[in-house]
Amino acid sequence: MTTQPLLIAIAPGIALALIIYLTDWHEREPLRLLLKLFAIGFIAVIPTAIIEQGLLMLNPFTGILSIAFIAFLIAGFTEELVKRHLVIRYALNRVEFDERLDGIIYSVFIALGFATAENINYVVFAFASNPYVGIYRGLISVPAHMLFAITMGYYISLSKFSIDTGLKRAYLRKALVMPFLFHGIFDFILMAQMDIVLLAFIPFTIYLWVTNLKKLNSYYRDSKNNHRQH
C-alpha cells in the first residue's frame, strides 16, 4: 500500500473537521474530546458494515426497488441511526455541551470519523485501481456526511435545550429522520444511474449546502450572542 491513496482518503475528513473546529472560535470544544469523537466514529464503521452486509443479504427486491432499499434502509437509516446513537451515548450529556453550536460540532466530528474510515476502505482497498474515486468521494461523499451531521446536530441541540419533554423526544426523532432522508435521497440519486434522477443531483446538493449552512450560521450567531452577554 502506497502512502498517496491513504493521504487522499483521509485528507477530506480532516480538512472539514478542522474547518468546523475553527468555526467554533468563541468557545472551542476540548480538542481531546473532539479527537475521541472522531475516533469513535471511525471505529463504528466496522460494526455498521457488518449490519449492512446482513441487511444486504435480506434485500428482497430487484431493480430500482433494490436500489431504494440499499440507499434508504441499508445506507441511510443504518448509518444515521448508528451516528445518532454515538452522539447520544458519548456527547449529549457531557458538561462541555453547553450551547447549541456544540451539538453540530460533536455530530460532525463523529460523522467525519465515520466518513474517513469509509473513505479509506473505498480509496485504498475497494477501488485502489481507480484514481478518480478519491477525488469524487473527497468532493461529494465526505462533505455529504458532514451536511447530514449538521442537520443531526441541529436537532440534537434543540432536544437538549428544550424544557418540554415531548419536544425533546420529537427533536431526537427528527435528529434521525431528517439525516436519514437526506442520506437516502442523496445515495439513491447517485445509485439509480437514471438520467431523469441524476438531473436532481445538483439542485439537491445545492439545497443541502444552503439549508445546512443556514443551520450552522444560526447556531454560530447564537454562540456569538451568548459570549457577548458574558
Please provide the spans of the model-predicted regions.
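Hydrophobic alpha-helical segments at protein termini of multi-pass membrane proteins
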Residues: M1-H230
